[in-house]
Curated annotation (Swiss-Prot):
CDD domains: DltA
UniProt protein name: D-alanine--D-alanyl carrier protein ligase
Role this protein plays: Catalyzes the first step in the D-alanylation of lipoteichoic acid (LTA), the activation of D-alanine and its transfer onto the D-alanyl carrier protein (Dcp) DltC. In an ATP-dependent two-step reaction, forms a high energy D-alanyl-AMP intermediate, followed by transfer of the D-alanyl residue as a thiol ester to the phosphopantheinyl prosthetic group of the Dcp. D-alanylation of LTA plays an important role in modulating the properties of the cell wall in Gram-positive bacteria, influencing the net charge of the cell wall.
PANTHER family membership: ENZYME, PUTATIVE (JCVI)-RELATED, PTHR45398
Originating species: Streptococcus pyogenes serotype M28 (strain MGAS6180)
Length: 512
């Protein structure tokens, strides 16, 4: 068990100073370098005399300087707000207006001119590193202090800043490095794929730094080159893969993504969106000896609140895979619309309690009051997810409350429709979306479909293909759930975080 994240990093700087903490295509930085650089940057930040404990926005990609700056800010007592280089200027501006950071550190060129907030460039960070200033930690982030603030997309389009404290982070990290499901080895070799602005990134950097391992990052230029990306990943000595299931589906389009080409890769950690039976089955085919860990949890509960190892038996027997056993320190409950706790097997809203629950949204008391509350004397959060608990305390996922629609008199869960379509042997990926009329009532249900290789060639017309797909799933799907129209695509759009961008597809069919 670790008691302080920075203490852990400092310990490895002493015991394994020359061991790589960060590797980007063979160019690496060591734990000793990380300590020296973060000390120097922390001293530089202190010299700016910022308001104590004020948040600092850090703009950039998955570079070493981003990591060193995060560690430095923690040492100097400031929460960091990671903003990815691919963020739209409008979103960056919205984050700044909400967070009111005391400083902006631009590891990459900053796309906006902001009045009233000082901006530190990469050249200034480099100069600070060269100064090699010693640093004594007297006011570092601890306890209930904010460690990082990650902005998620709000339902109104206005981003919300989730405040994660040092205590929140320790709750998650200690669970992950000690829980048998994750089976994290000492000195883990982890692929650093999700951007730092996505809290799934915490699932790779937190256990890696806590256990003295190495992060294998990819330059942003490579990430944009799909073919070269997965050819390169296959050459990396990573043992643990952390991503959304959608990113793994993309990886499996490359023949190099298999156990024969990547023998060191033994663990897959998934979070951020639902892991489907189809994706898990394909992974077992590609990596017969690998462990697949399905984790679940919102950003507001610090990355994940439950996890479970997915077995072949689960793949064969479940239509929707279980999302795990709740963390021991984070009791998870199912409640009805009146807030009453439901019994095992009953479906309702998933709520999480305990020390990993965020204190709320930064500078947004109204939204905080809506989502955060107290349950059985513990801080609690409304996930907005539908689920149930088995008698063995395994959490089952039933979709999003806000993805439920009323159609033809029936209440339909969109994710359930997508799941059923994904069961077709002809379908690689499917997403169900509603089309609304002028009264904003559901007019009909459509589905975006990506078929497996070679499927289209077997049919002369799309109509015949559609009939075949419908026939392949009709025995498991209620007729009122069947989409009236299939829209075929070569790929589905992804968000910057690697999730299928359902909102974009809904807007597309409704001409928004």
């Amino acid at each position: 068990m670790i008691k302080d994240m920075i203490d852990s990093i400092e310990q490895f700087a002493q015991t394994q100073a020359d061991f790589p903490v960060y590797d980007c295509l063979g160019e690496h930085r060591t734990y000793g370098q990380l300590k020296r650089d973060s000390d120097s940057i922390a001293a530089f930040i202190d010299s700016l005399a910022l308001l104590a404990k004020s948040p600092v926005l850090v703009f950039g990609a998955q570079t070493y300087d981003m990591l060193a700056t995060f560690v430095a800010l923690t040492k100097s007592g400031h929460a960091y707000i990671p903003v990815d280089v691919h963020s739209a200027p409008e979103r960056i501006l919205a984050i700044i207006e909400i967070a009111k950071p005391s400083l902006i550190i631009a590891i990459e060129e900053f796309p906006l001119t902001i009045e009233g907030i000082s901006l530190v460039s990469l050249s200034e960070i480099e100069s600070a590193k060269l100064a090699e200033m010693p640093y004594e930690r007297t006011h570092s982030v601890k306890g209930d202090d904010n460690y990082y603030i990650i902005f998620t997309s709000g339902t109104t389009g206005q981003p919300k800043g989730v405040q994660i404290s040092h205590d929140n982070l320790l709750s998650f990290t200690n669970w992950m490095i000690e829980d048998a499901a994750f089976d994290v080895p000492k000195q883990p070799q982890m692929l650093a794929q999700p951007p730092y602005s996505f809290d799934l990134s915490v699932m790779y950097w937190a256990p890696t730094l806590a256990l003295g391992g190495t992060l294998f990052a990819l330059p942003k230029e490579l990430v944009a080159d799909f073919k070269q990306l997965f050819t390169t990943i296959a050459q990396l000595p990573v043992g643990i893969w952390t991503s959304t299931p959608s990113f793994a589906d993309m990886a499996m389009l490359s023949d190099d993504f298999c156990q024969a080409k990547m023998p060191a890769l033994t663990h897959f950690y998934f979070d951020g969106e639902e892991l489907t039976v189809s994706t898990a089955r394909k992974l077992f085919e590609r990596f017969p000896s690998a462990k697949i860990i399905n984790a679940y949890g919102p950003t507001e509960a610090t990355v994940a609140l439950s996890a479970i190892e997915i077995t072949r038996e689960m793949v064969d027997n479940y239509t929707r895979l279980p999302i795990g056993y709740p963390k021991p320190d984070s009791p998870t409950y199912i409640i009805d619309e009146d807030g009453k706790e439901l019994a095992s097997g009953e479906q309702g809203e998933i709520i999480v309690t305990g020390p990993a629950v965020s204190k709320g949204y930064l500078n947004n008391p109204e939204k905080t009051a809506e989502a955060f509350f107290t349950f059985k004397g513990q801080p609690a959060y409304h996930t907005g997810d539908i689920g149930s608990l088995t008698e063995d305390n395994i959490l089952l996922y039933g979709g999003r409350l806000d993805f439920q629609i009323k159609y033809a008199g029936y209440r339909i869960e969109l994710e359930d429709v997508s799941q059923q379509l994904n069961q077709s042997p002809m379908v690689a990926s499917a997403v169900a979306v509603p089309r609304y009329n002028k009264e904003h009532k559901v007019q009909n249900l459509l589905a975006y479909i990506v078929v497996k290789d070679g499927v289209k060639e077997r049919f002369d017309r799309e109509l015949e293909l559609t009939k075949a797909i419908k026939a392949s799933v009709k025995d498991h799907m209620m007729s009122y759930m069947m989409p009236s129209k299939f829209l075929y695509r070569d790929s589905l759009p992804l968000t910057p975080n690697g999730k299928i961008d359902i909102k974009t597809l809904i807007n597309e069919v409704n001409n928004r």
